[in-house]
Amino acid sequence: HWLARAPGEQRGAARIAARAWAAAFVALATACAIYPVVATRARWRDRFDAATGFTLDGQAYMKTARHVELGQTFALGPDLEAMRWLEQHIEGTPVIAEAHTPEYRWGARISTNTGLPTILGWSWHQTQQRASLPADLVTRRAADVDAIYRDVSVDRVLGILDRYRVDYVYVGALERIFYPSAGLEKFAGNPDRWQPVYRNAGVTIYRVVR
C-alpha cells in the first residue's frame, strides 16, 4: 500500500516545493522592483537638497548645497556663479589653475563643470590612463599645483604657470581651505602679475599677465 502511494505523494511534495519556490521568486522579484523606487528617492534625499526638485540641470544642486572639506563647511553657490561667468565670458580653452585635492573631494570642480583644461584632475584616473609614461608625472603636477598656491615667490610661481601655459588662477573657498593665506595673498598683492577679472562673495579669478 505504501509503495503504491509513494509516487503520488512524491508528486504532491514536488508541487508544494514548486509553489514555494514560485512564491519566493515572486517575493524576490517584487522586492527588486520596489527597491529602485524607494531606495533611489531615499538616496537622493540623503545626498541632495530636496528643494532642488527633479531637473536635467546637473549643476542645479550647487545653488543651495553646502560642502565640507577638512572639517570646514562652505556653500557651492559662489563656485556655480564663477563657473557660469567663465562659460559666458571666456573664449577658447585656456588653462585654469585650481586646487588639487585627494580623490572623492571637490578638487578639479571648475575643469569638470566648465570643460576648461586644468593642470591636474583626478590623480588616479590620470595615473591609470598614462601608465606608459614616467611614474612621477602625476605626482610632479600635484606638487606644482601645490606650489602655485603655497609658494610666496612671485617668480617661481610665474615659472610654473608658464610651464603649463596657465591663463587663469582660481581662488575660491576650496583654495582657502587647502592652502595658507600667505600663498594666496600674493595674487591680490601683485595686480601687475595677476589681474583680477572676476569676483563674487567667495571667489576671485585672476588672469595671468604676460
Task: Locate predicted features.
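Extracytoplasmic
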Residues: 36-210
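Signature aromatic-anchored transmembrane alpha helix within multi-pass, membrane-resident enzymes
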Residues: 2-41, 47
